[in-house]
């Protein structure tokens, strides 16, 4: 057992110091075309130490967790911070916050690490069986879970201990007919294994049926259209195009279309964008970020007006802003500004009302990735499938649908959001780090270029 009181004393160096101690366990199962390719378990422990001296950071990590090693790391980080300060060209100010003492758990109803590996394997196999069809030529299913025990302490007096689990499952298939290849995919996950048990069967069938539907799809028309984005694609747009542009580190690097726009209108009155780490059970939720700041509900855009950026303690200090609890890190990496669960606030429309009111347009569903330039404010996404809207009804299934345009232009042209609410699960990459996130909202109607 570590002597945490001793470690707290060791942190009394420089102007600020913090330590993250992680104990982790992970499990992975992968299946490809009916055969289990991998069943593995792993354990990983580690320590990350940051020390601030004037305007210089020192940061070190180790996979050895012992009091002797921790003392060495703190001393090394302190020396590095002093050297870094000599070459620093910017002032570093950490936003003040009240010290926290807490011990918490975020595990869900069923701890995935308590579920027998045989039960997990049977669910993987059952998923595969429900995705089979004579036109389905390839199926892959993967499952992973992680359990982590974390200890976080800072020289300002916080000591936070937590236990967290997450599990996620991906299912993918490829359908083929007369040389035509189409793709279907779904995913589910959360803090508890119940998210897998409750959802995997329906999602397996949906992935299969989507691939089969797309075999009969016609190419999507190109041009400027009134479009409805489903919650998944709307969420990807909000996350990638709006959420990243609201991250304060990108703003400070002059790499955001939202720079110098606080208090200004950046979208229509129907656009309210929220980042919320407190949603119970959502994949991107957390009690505290990796700087010990409590996770919060942050309104980024309210009725079209840009209200705030997302912050770490350092960016909040530099911009004299309120803390938002978005300093996150993957494993032992440095905390940087990251989203949690980011979504567009639901509106008043039902989907049926919105469809009937649209008359002519295109309904875009799902996301197959894309590109965003947050500095120039440009984006391009690919939808998984689409439908032609004629006389307020969904008619022809469409394939090869893309969405592109200017971020602000799309936001200003939003004129309706449905009242249903969905959050997708996944991981977001930035600066070589991947963290769990959620994104979504309701269906969104706007005008965009379909490409």
From Swiss-Prot:
Q: Which UniProt keywords apply?
A: Hydrolase, Metalloprotease, Protease
Q: Which Pfam families match?
A: PmbA_TldD_1st, PmbA_TldD_2nd, PmbA_TldD_3rd
Could you say which EC number(s) this protein's record lists? 3.4.-.-
One GO BP annotation of this record:
proteolysis
Species, as recorded: Methanocaldococcus jannaschii (strain ATCC 43067 / DSM 2661 / JAL-1 / JCM 10045 / NBRC 100440) (Methanococcus jannaschii)
Single GO term (MF): metallopeptidase activity
- Assigned GO CC terms: cytosol
Which PANTHER family does the record associate with it? METALLOPROTEASE SLR0863, UNCHARACTERIZED PROTEIN TLDD AND PMBA
Q: What name does this protein carry?
A: Metalloprotease MJ0996
Q: Name the Gene3D superfamilies on file.
A: PmbA/TldD superfamily
Keyword presence, Protease? yes
Superkingdom of the source species: Archaea
Q: What does this protein do?
A: Probable metalloprotease.
Show which residues constitute the signal peptide: none
Instruction: Give the record's family classification.
Output: Belongs to the peptidase U62 family.
């Amino acid at each position: 057992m570590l002597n945490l009181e001793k470690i707290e004393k060791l942190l009394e160096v420089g102007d600020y110091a913090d330590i993250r101690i992680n104990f982790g366990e992970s499990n992975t199962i992968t299946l490809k075309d009916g055969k289990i390719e991998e069943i593995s378990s792993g354990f990983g422990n580690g320590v990350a130490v940051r020390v601030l001296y004037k305007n210089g950071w020192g940061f070190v990590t180790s996979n050895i967790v012992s009091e002797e090693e921790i003392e060495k790391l703190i001393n090394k980080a302190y020396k590095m911070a002093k050297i870094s300060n000599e070459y620093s060209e910017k002032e570093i100010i950490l936003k003040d916050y009240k010290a926290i003492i807490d011990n918490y758990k975020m595990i869900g109803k069923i701890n995935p690490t308590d579920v027998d590996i045989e039960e997990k394997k049977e669910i993987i196999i059952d998923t595969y069986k429900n995705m089979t069809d004579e036109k389905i030529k390839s199926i892959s299913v993967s499952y992973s879970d992680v359990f982590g025990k974390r200890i976080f302490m800072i020289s300002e007096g916080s000591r936070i201990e937590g236990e967290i689990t997450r599990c996620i499952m991906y299912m993918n298939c490829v359908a083929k007919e007369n040389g035509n290849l189409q793709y279907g995919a779904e995913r589910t996950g959360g803090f508890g294994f119940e998210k897998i048990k409750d959802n995997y069967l329906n999602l397996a069938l949906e992935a299969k049926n989507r691939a089969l539907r797309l075999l009969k799809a016609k190419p999507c028309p190109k041009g400027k259209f009134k479009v409805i984005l489903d919650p998944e694609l709307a969420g990807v747009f909000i996350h990638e195009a709006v959420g990243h542009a609201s991250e304060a580190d990108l703003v400070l690097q002059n790499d955001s279309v939202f720079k110098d726009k606080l208090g200004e209108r950046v979208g229509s009155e129907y656009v309210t964008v929220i980042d919320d780490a407190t949603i119970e059970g959502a994949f991107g939720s957390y009690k505290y970020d990796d700087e010990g700041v409590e996770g919060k509900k942050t309104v980024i855009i309210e009725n079209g007006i840009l209200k705030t950026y997302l912050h770490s303690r350092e960016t909040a200090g530099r911009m004299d802003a309120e803390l938002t609890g978005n300093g996150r890190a993957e494993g032992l990496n440095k905390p940087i500004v990251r989203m949690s669960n980011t979504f567009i606030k639901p509106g008043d429309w039902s989907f049926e009302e919105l469809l009937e009111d649209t008359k002519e347009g295109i309904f875009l569903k799902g996301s197959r990735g894309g590109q965003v330039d947050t500095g120039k404010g440009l984006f391009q996404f690919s939808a998984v499938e689409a439908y032609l809207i004629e006389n307020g009804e969904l008619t022809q299934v469409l394939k090869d649908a893309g969405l592109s345009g200017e971020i602000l232009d799309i936001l200003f042209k939003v004129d309706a959001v449905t009242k249903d609410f969905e959050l997708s699960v996944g991981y977001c990459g930035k600066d070589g780090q991947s963290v769990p996130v959620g994104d979504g909202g309701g269906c969104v109607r706007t005008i965009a270029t379909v490409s």
